[in-house]
Amino acid sequence: MVAQGFTVDLKKPLVFQVGHLGEDYEEWVHQPIATKEGPRFFQSDFWEFLTLTVWWAVPVIWLPVVVWCISRSVSMGCSLPEIVPIVVMGIFIWTFFEYVLHRFVFHIKTKSYWGNTAHYLIHGCHHKHPMDHLRLVFPPTATAILCFPFWNIAKAISTPSTAPALFGGGMLGYVMYDVTHYYLHHAQPTRPVTKNLKKYHLNHHFRIQDKGFGITSSLWDIVFGTLPTTKAPRKEQ
């Protein structure tokens, strides 16, 4: 199904075109088009609608889940001094999950028709159109699917009474991640920390796309040696 020398027509729905690029997909998807208006994905208005998510849907949908999870642990006998470090641990675990997901799933290399198509839907579209404000945060359905492995991890490493709080902390970490991600693309930070985060992330998009996988911090890039060269620690003379 891969067409030799295929050229994508940006005026037509893209999803079922990109698979035809074959091995050329990797180069094509990492040549960003930095316009605010995103492309059309599907001919069908219904399927097109499902690909669009406003940023504020993330806190509106998932913060109540965070509150409910923490309240469950409280109702099962956990005190506030016990819950706070558990929630913080959940946030910390999310940062690792964020890194692994971004590096090994979102940046997997593909060349088959369906591999390219799936990758474009999952993350390739964001690299091709990084300023598309309606396809930047996770759609609620995708987040719900990711909840299952994270919930199983929470249950496996904690007790029945603390698992909801740990999961809630992870979900809070996710909300912070997605809102931060949107902010880095569409806001103009004035504080040094957020200015550096924006520079760090846009460096991943426009300069060194196989480094700098952390969104909310560069911690795991430092740990696993994927810090961009401009951020790497200087060697002593």
From Swiss-Prot:
Binds 2 Zn(2+) ions per subunit that likely form a catalytic dimetal center. The chain crosses the membrane at residues 50-70, 80-100, 137-157, 164-184. It is a multi-pass membrane protein. It catalyses: an N-(1,2-saturated acyl)sphinganine + 2 Fe(II)-[cytochrome b5] + O2 + 2 H(+) = an N-[(2'R)-hydroxyacyl]sphinganine + 2 Fe(III)-[cytochrome b5] + H2O. The keyword tRNA-binding does not apply. Its main location: endoplasmic reticulum. Its EC number is 1.14.18.7. One of its GO terms (molecular function) is dihydroceramide fatty acyl 2-hydroxylase activity. It comes from the Eukaryota. It is found in: Endoplasmic reticulum membrane. Pfam families: FA_hydroxylase. The keyword Cell division does not apply. Induction: Up-regulated by H(2)O(2) treatment. Zn(2+) 1 binds at residues 102, 107, 123, 127, 204. Zn(2+) 2 binds at residues 126, 181, 185, 201, 205. One of its GO terms (biological process) is fatty acid biosynthetic process. GO terms for cellular component: endoplasmic reticulum membrane. Fatty acid 2-hydroxylase involved in the alpha-hydroxylation of sphingolipid-associated very long-chain fatty acids (VLCFA). Probably involved in the resistance response to oxidative stress. Belongs to the sterol desaturase family. Interacts with CYTB5-A, CYTB5-B, CYTB5-C and CYTB5-D. Interacts indirectly with BI-1 via CYTB5-D. This is Dihydroceramide fatty acyl 2-hydroxylase FAH1. It comes from Arabidopsis thaliana (Mouse-ear cress). The gene is FAH1.
